[in-house]
């Protein structure tokens, strides 16, 4: 029997060795919260889809470096495609000029070649985008776009400025589709855009999800996946449940937040036994407590800084994973500097400062000064459970020194408008820091004339070292007057299968799908 058993075992081994290896998966299922009105809508779910469907001439990668996409190369001084024109009489400080060369293989998803005219058309479109939108802000940094040839375009930037993000000004839109198009055609395009990304919308089932099919002629090569399935959920709890049941593979930021760290540590800890891996990324963004005009007294702002225990807030909401910043600029932003650790809470000193400002305890211990009582509202931008929880903790801390604060959640645009006008009491808002110029401009006119002068100087600084020194001084001035109170550095959370290669979250909060062409499963 033994020889027979040995023979059978040998045969089984041979058969298993000859058995075909199961192919790696070619599809992935992504879960999103909320169904957008269109792919190009201003909605978190839309941005995740749009990043897979659209493409730019140049993008920022996961290390914050510029990388060419539709362009052959990133224009630089070294390769001769970036220059400063000092011969323009209207720009005594010089004018930045960048030349972009479109790859010969760059195609729209309908097969048409992408041309320099498409770049100029996109700039024309962006100039009429809603005021305050990212497209409009970027377009306004450009003086003009010149078509040099079919595949070469020159971008001339605003006078007397140096913009670190200059390569991002070159976008494309299909001129042959949208030029002269009716409102209905444009609306249909926004819902289902034909662009140049690695995936195209193949199907959209309202109320359920979408199918994105790989674009085989994608400029950087055929995508590693053949299909991305998108599923829409009502809220993050439903998405988390689907993730735990393996009904979806990927939950990209901001679907889940770092306040779920304890749950995610059990579900997606990245160990061999876990199917999922959680990516935590310190983002170039800050959740900030902004002061309204009624807090014009620096002593009162300092008292609030000494009252709010930001480290305790971070420990409570994020299990200590997030960082408490001191500045409106945070690493890895190139202009961020180290301003030391935040001061420890000192509520006795806070009470002394408030007393020096004329406040005394009134009925129910609420501080008052003459007819003014410190009963106020903290406006909170919706869209983040963690942000609302943080605002509630701030309100609790303020109550300890006699400031009665009620938390009111409102749409982001509404809260941003309040902050811009100063008509709010206090507000908790997200503030992007990836562009130091734009981040600084939020505080122009609010700190002092010298701050405004330095902000202008930083925009036109010729050398990176000079610009960083100026931004460093701007951050010190912001800190000295307590222009705002940075509560915590935003910590983005992305969850994906351990076996899905190519997943690379970015610190600048690009949608996780920014490099979806590189995604591929490394095992069945």
Locate the predicted segments by residue.
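Gly/Pro-rich hinge or "lid" segments in bacterial periplasmic/extracellular proteins
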Residues: 60-65, 139-140, 168-223, 227, ...
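Ligand-site clamp/hinge motif
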Residues: 187, 216-263, 392-396, 402-406, ...
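N-terminal lobe/hinge region of extracytoplasmic solute-binding protein
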Residues: 31-90, 192-195
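Extracellular/periplasmic solute-recognition and catalytic clefts
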Residues: 144, 202-211, 229-293, 311, ...
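Detector for C-terminal structural segments
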Residues: 205-208, 214, 305-341, 346-351, ...
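Alpha-helical secondary-structure segments
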Residues: 29, 115-122, 150-156, 197-198, ...
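Aromatic- and charge-enriched surface segment that lines or borders ligand/interaction sites
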Residues: 74-132, 154, 242, 296
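Surface-exposed binding/hinge segments that line
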Residues: 101, 120, 135-181, 203, ...
């Amino acid at each position: 029997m033994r020889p027979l058993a040995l023979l059978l075992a040998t045969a089984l081994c041979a058969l298993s060795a000859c058995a075909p290896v199961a192919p790696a998966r070619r599809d992935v299922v992504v879960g999103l919260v909320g169904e957008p009105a269109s792919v190009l809508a201003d909605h978190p779910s839309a941005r995740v889809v749009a990043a897979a469907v659209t493409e730019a001439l140049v993008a920022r990668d996961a290390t914050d470096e510029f990388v060419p996409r539709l362009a052959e190369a990133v224009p630089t001084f070294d390769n001769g495609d970036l220059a400063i024109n000092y011969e323009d009489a209207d720009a005594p400080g010089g004018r930045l000029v960048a030349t972009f060369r479109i790859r010969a293989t760059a195609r729209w998803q309908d097969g048409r070649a992408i041309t320099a005219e498409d770049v100029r058309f996109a700039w024309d479109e962006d100039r009429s985008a809603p005021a305050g939108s990212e497209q409009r802000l970027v377009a306004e940094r450009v003086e003009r776009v010149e078509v040099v040839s079919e595949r070469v375009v020159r971008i001339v930037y605003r006078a007397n400025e140096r913009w670190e993000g200059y390569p991002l000004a070159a976008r494309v839109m299909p001129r042959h589709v949208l030029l002269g198009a009716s409102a209905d055609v444009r609306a249909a395009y926004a819902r289902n855009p034909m662009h140049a990304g690695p995936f195209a919308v193949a199907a959209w089932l309202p109320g359920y999800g979408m199918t994105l099919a790989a674009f085989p002629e994608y400029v950087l090569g055929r995508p590693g996946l053949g299909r991305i399935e998108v599923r829409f959920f009502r809220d993050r709890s439903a998405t988390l449940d689907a993730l735990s049941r393996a009904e979806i593979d990927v939950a990209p930021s901001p679907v889940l937040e770092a306040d779920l760290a304890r749950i995610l540590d059990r579900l997606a800890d990245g160990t061999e036994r876990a199917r999922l891996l959680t990516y935590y990324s310190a983002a170039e963004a800050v959740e900030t407590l902004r002061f309204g005009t009624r807090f014009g007294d620096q002593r009162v702002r300092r008292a609030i800084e000494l009252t709010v225990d930001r480290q305790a807030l971070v420990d409570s909401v994020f299990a200590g994973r997030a960082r408490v910043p001191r500045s409106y600029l945070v690493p890895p932003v190139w202009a961020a500097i180290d301003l030391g650790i935040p001061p420890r809470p000192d509520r006795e000193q806070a009470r002394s400062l408030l007393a020096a400002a004329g406040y005394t305890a009134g009925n129910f211990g609420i501080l008052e000064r003459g007819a003014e009582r410190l009963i106020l509202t903290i406006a909170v931008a919706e869209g983040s459970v963690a942000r609302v929880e943080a605002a509630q903790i701030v309100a609790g801390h303020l109550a300890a020194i006699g400031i009665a604060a009620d938390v009111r959640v409102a749409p982001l645009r509404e809260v941003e408008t309040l902050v811009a006008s100063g008509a709010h009491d206090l507000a908790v808002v997200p503030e992007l820091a990836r562009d130091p110029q734009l981040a600084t401009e939020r505080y122009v006119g609010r700190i002092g004339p010298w701050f405004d002068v330095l902000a202008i100087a930083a925009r036109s600084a010729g050398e990176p070292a000079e610009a960083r020194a100026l931004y460093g001084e701007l951050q010190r001035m912001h800190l000295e007057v307590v222009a705002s109170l940075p509560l915590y550095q935003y910590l983005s959370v992305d969850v994906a299968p351990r076996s899905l290669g190519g997943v690379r979250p970015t610190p600048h909060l690009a949608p996780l799908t920014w490099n979806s062409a590189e995604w591929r499963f490394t095992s069945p």
